Each structure stands twice: as structure tokens, then as C-alpha cells.
Amino acid sequence: MYCSAMPEAASAPAVRATIGDSEFDRDTALTRRAPGVYDIDLSAGWTIISAVNGGYLLAVLGRALVDTLPHGDPFTISAHYLTASRPGPAVVRTDVVRTGRTLSTGQASLFQYDDEGREVERIRVLASYGDLDALPDDVRTTARPPAIPPLEHCFGPEDGPAPVPGSSALADRLMLKLDPSTLGWALGKPSGKGEMRAWFGFADGRDHDPLSVLLAVDALPPTAFELGLKGWVPTVELTVHVRCRPAPGPLRVSITTRNLAGGFLEEDAEVWDSAGRLVAQSRQLARVRLG
């Protein structure tokens, strides 16, 4: 259940974290062991139930590729989620596929050891990087920002008197305020429309950059909830296109599902910044439990 009163958490923190010095930056930081080999301890703070969030994992691999490639901004990144990642030690291995004047392409994989001591690949990524600041200013688009009510009229997990279904450790690290028209699932009255919209930010006040956008596309409750489904909705594949560097301030995220078939659905996301620019688009294929 959600209540109408807004919590103090909706206001900006007294001391805002900065890009490069925030919980997100610390928890996605890697230690280079050798060229193309990185160690990381995946934080339990970015989990849903016990599984590590896919957007957080994408940001981890995205950061490894920043160190590997000569260009620093992800333009397009596609990930296949092979097995569920767990909090704890992991190894990321990267390779350069091709380098060019404006774009560089690389691949990365994250590995962990299973209970039998075998190394298991968790996620594999192929990505192209460039320089977002070098792109021309010309924009020709029919896309429009989502019509989300003002932040003070939206609601987050902390607004209810009891934990919201699907709440997680991830939610504690975010400033997430959902459009009331996409909250029917939390009241036991899902709309059936397969839509989710929200204001998105970090609880510590950190502004956004291309790596945090990789988290934003996969941080909202699943659209499956508004379709009347419950339970875990694991990502099979996720592709993100980063279109420009985000302006300071919260992001608006809109996610839509049009087709659920055979136990799978797509989630198409748009991420808009405070300047009204479309900063990222994504599509993911996810598995759902029917019945």
C-alpha cells in the first residue's frame, strides 16, 4: 500500500554525492589485476531479493570497458544474462574488438565461482564506445517526454506503511518515485497496460552520467506487475543506446510492454533528463512466470 504523505527522503540529501565519489561509483569500481582482467566485489546493496540487479551489472561491465577502450562513453551496449549473479567476488575479462577514430568496440564477460568451485560466466557484453561531447547538436525527433506528474505527486517504496511487494535492497539506494497511474499493482488493482513510469535518481543525490543511465533502464518495478503477474522477472537480453550526456537533476524513465507471449515479454524504455532530452533508449527481453 502507498500513502499520500511524502517522506523526507524525497528531498535532496544535506550533502550531495558527486560523480566519482558516490555509493554507485564505489560499488562499480574495479581493480585491474592485469590488462583486460579486473576484480570486483559485487555489492549486496544492488540486489532484488538475492539476485544482483541487471542494470548494476551492466554498469560494472560498462566501467570495465571504459578502462579498456580508448573512448570513454558507451554508445550502444548489449548484454546477455547467462546465469544469476550473486553478491561477492567476481572477475571481469575484457577484449578490444576494434578501435577507430570515432568508435571503439569491445566485449566483456563477468565470472563467478559456483558452489562446486567451478568458474561460471554470468553475463556477456558487446559494446561500442565514443565521445558523446563530440556529437553534433542537430536533433530531429518525434519523441516526446513521458507525461509524469510532478515528483511531489508521485510515490516510492518508502511511502507505504509496510514493505511494498517487490521492494529490495536496490530501492534503498535510489530516489524512485512512481507515476500513480502505473501503481495499480501495488494496490492489488493492476491496470493491465504493461506500463511503468517514474522519476529516477540516487538517494545520495549523485547526478547522472552515461554509466548510471545503464542502471536507470533496469531499476523500475517490472511492467509485468501492471499486467497482473508476480514474482521475479529475470532479464535474458538487454540493449541500451546512450544518446547524449544527461543534464544534472532527476531522470524521467518510461517503460512499455506491448507483447507477452510464451512466457517472455519485452520492455522498451526511454530515459529523459531534466533538460527534456532523450538521453537513452533500451529494449530488454525478460522471462515471466505465468499462472
Predicted region positions:
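Terminal targeting signals and extreme-terminal segments of soluble enzymes
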Residues: 2-291
